[in-house]
Amino acid sequence: MLAGVLLLQSWLKANYPQVQFGSYGVQEGEFYLDFKVEKSFSIKEFEQLEQDLNAYFNQLNNVVQTKIDKTKSLKFFQADPFTTTLIESIESNSLVVTTVNEQTFWVHDLVLPLPKQGFVKLLNVSANYFLGDPTKPQLQRLVGIFAASKEQLKSLIAANEQKYQNDHRAIGKRLEIFTFDPLVGAGFPIWLEKGAVLKKIIGDFVHYQQLMFGFKTVSSPVLANLELYKISGHYVHYSEDMFPSVKLENQMMMLRPMTCPHHCLIFKHKRRSYKELPQRFCEDSILHRFEASGGLTGLERVRCMTLLDNHIFCRTDQIKAEIKNAFKLIQTVNNKFGFSFDRIDLALHDPNNKAKFIDNDQLWANSESQIESVFKELNVPYKIDVGAAAFYGPKIDFQFKTALNKMITIATIQLDFLLPERFELRYFDEQSNAQTPVIIHVGIVGTYERFIAALLEKTHGNLPLWMAPVQVVVIPVNIDKHEKAAKKLYQKLLKENIRVSLDESEDRLGKKVRTAIVNKIPLQIIVGDKEMQDLTRITCRGFKGEKVQKLYWANFVKKVRKDG
């Protein structure tokens, strides 16, 4: 795919000598290139541009890779500030550059030789801030597919189209789960009726499990005094990811980016005995984080989100039991939703890097050994990443691969030794001596937004009956003749607390059935002449083409209760 980057760079340089190049790379089988040029490209030009690029590939001659030192490369590319910035960020003093037709480019990962033929399919053009930073210049980004033959290109295009059909953004649009609107703002999702119902279904199940695993529900405001985040350290370290503060009655207030400081105050509001620990708090927290516009991705990466947040305040001797409890909670919930994690990462501290981590060897050794013993007892495979722990404690990440082959974190368990110190949290031991608790941050499913994105991609939108926003659709064969009976049945289903819709369109029966299939509604009830005469007999079918069933009313309700 990097041959596509080199081809595009070379063609741009030949046609627009003043072009400047930003980031490039390969993601999920596609290549992309950021660049600055006076010409603004549009999708309407793609067909001609593809022809030009395919023809130009045959003109790529004398492709040579050369190793040069960093100082020389910075001098060589000094006319291109974006390339020099990228080179400066490289730690190595030796770089590889690629020369084509006597023009040199920084495509350091390219593998030679190039194929004998080259074919390009362009997919998208967009505007992106350099390095995703809104304070930096905006560049154009072209995204495409490169192949060494027409047959390979055709195969890659088909695979790419299938991949995007399974993208949660496409599924969410087709099923009317969520939407975005520029009047609300980029990164601020709007939940449509079905999406709001799906959120509630997920929330109800998770909330019940939180209760069963000993968590207590609390609630805190979305706005807080800036001083709170200065105490927690979030403002110092993450202010660029937070929304700007606002002055209210001589106080600087800020939309919260996380809930842990609030839960610290809940723990602190009264004297705590060692007998009261652990304290487990949970909250559905609305959070705001100022993600760069270039990084926003459907529901996966947004600026406003609701986190099913959990915090455990415990003694150091309780760490193992609490992690085991949290681990089982995460497994219980995610198994119910059909998730098996592709990878579990255990991030540990590096004992040789004292500057990067809290300086308490005994605390690190104790907590990390307790975590590893949990993995061994549960016989769960995991990957150790030494040096990847947070400054304030070790972390467990539960990873899931999306339809676009991107690994995302769904659930987390994070130990925190720092926040209890910052907020001077204390409990009193058997001798009435003040001791500092440990905080364990637990993300069971993460945010509703990211979890639903992963759920839609995993199921392709085919949600099981118990999870479907609409479980049953009532379809009158003839709207004029059968509507009254269909409405009666619809009302009966509502009273049974079954999530039901009524198709009141004037479409023919075949189209109504197809609409239900497209909307992936698990059960369809057909109301015709026979059903109109006796509403105690139900004619139903599944959206996947199952045989039509005729059931008595009580048996149908029992079926929905059992499966839903």
From Swiss-Prot:
Name by which UniProt lists this protein: Threonine--tRNA ligase
EC annotation from Swiss-Prot or TrEMBL: 6.1.1.3
Family: Belongs to the class-II aminoacyl-tRNA synthetase family.
UniProt GO molecular function: ATP binding; metal ion binding; threonine-tRNA ligase activity; tRNA binding
InterPro entries assigned to the protein according to its UniProt record, in alphabetical order: aa-tRNA-synt_IIb, aa-tRNA-synth_II, aa-tRNA-synth_II/BPL/LPL, Anticodon-bd, Anticodon-bd_dom_sf, Thr-tRNA-ligase_IIa, Thr/Ala-tRNA-synth_IIc_edit, ThrRS_anticodon
Source organism of the structure: Mycoplasma pneumoniae (strain ATCC 29342 / M129 / Subtype 1) (Mycoplasmoides pneumoniae)
Gene3D superfamilies: 3.30.54.20, Anticodon-binding domain, Bira Bifunctional Protein, Domain 2, Threonyl-trna Synthetase, Chain A, domain 2
Lineage of the species this protein comes from: Bacteria, Bacillati, Mycoplasmatota, Mycoplasmoidales, Mycoplasmoidaceae
Biological process terms in GO annotation: threonyl-tRNA aminoacylation
Keyword tags: Aminoacyl-tRNA synthetase, ATP-binding, Cytoplasm, Ligase, Metal-binding, Nucleotide-binding, Protein biosynthesis, RNA-binding, tRNA-binding, Zinc
Locations listed in the record: Cytoplasm
UniProt cofactor note: Binds 1 zinc ion per subunit.
SUPFAM superfamilies: Class II aaRS ABD-related, Class II aaRS and biotin synthetases, ThrRS/AlaRS common domain
PROSITE patterns: AA_TRNA_LIGASE_II
Essential cofactor(s): Zn(2+)
Pfam families: HGTP_anticodon, tRNA-synt_2b
Main location: cytoplasm
Subunit: Homodimer.
Renumbered residue ranges of the record's region Catalytic: 167-464
Function comment: Catalyzes the attachment of threonine to tRNA(Thr) in a two-step reaction: L-threonine is first activated by ATP to form Thr-AMP and then transferred to the acceptor end of tRNA(Thr). Also edits incorrectly charged L-seryl-tRNA(Thr).
Root EC class: ligase
Any one GO cellular component localisation term in the record: cytoplasm
Record: residues binding Zn(2+): C260, H311, H441
